[in-house]
């Protein structure tokens, strides 16, 4: 099991301690809808499979300054009580700057992305876009981000 899944269990315990909880997982049909709308609105983008695995565990995360984007609210089958930073709407904002289109934005505190040109996961400084570090896998990037906030 990837390290980030163990760290997510720790975050769940912290949330429960304060009477809160993690978000529900995204369903397969919500992810299919998201993929379809991504193709329409963002072009020929393939959402990284490890990120989809994350969404199937928890539909986004907003914890201690780290935000990981989830399936956009208007694509969800059930209404939710809290705001989700939607993957599509957030990437549309990032893509207003042409140079940022080489990235698939997955979350932020600093910005968690997939670099489609270099085929690596990266952490970019927010707002300058300066590369902070790169990771060979989504699992390594997410584990690093979660370790920082726990």
List PLM regions with ranges.
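Segments surrounding the PLD/"HKD" phosphodiesterase catalytic module and close analogs
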Residues: 111-140
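A ubiquitous, low-specificity "background" feature that marks scattered single residues
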Residues: 76-78, 121, 143-145
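A short, charged
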Residues: 140-150
């Amino acid at each position: 099991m990837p390290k980030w899944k163990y760290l997510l269990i720790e975050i769940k315990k912290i949330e429960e301690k304060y009477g809160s909880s993690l978000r529900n997982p995204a369903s397969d049909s919500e992810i299919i809808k998201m993929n379809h709308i991504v193709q329409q609105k963002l072009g020929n983008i393939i959402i990284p499979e490890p990120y989809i695995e994350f969404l199937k565990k928890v539909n986004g995360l907003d914890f201690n300054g780290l935000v990981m984007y989830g399936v956009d609210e208007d694509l969800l089958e059930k209404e939710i009580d809290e705001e989700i930073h939607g993957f599509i709407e957030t990437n549309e904002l990032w893509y207003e700057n042409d140079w940022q289109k080489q990235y698939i934005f997955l979350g932020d505190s600093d910005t968690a992305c997939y670099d489609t040109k270099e085929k690596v996961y990266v952490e970019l400084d927010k707002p300058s876009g300066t590369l902070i570090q790169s990771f060979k896998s989504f699992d390594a990037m997410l584990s690093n981000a979660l370790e920082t906030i726990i």
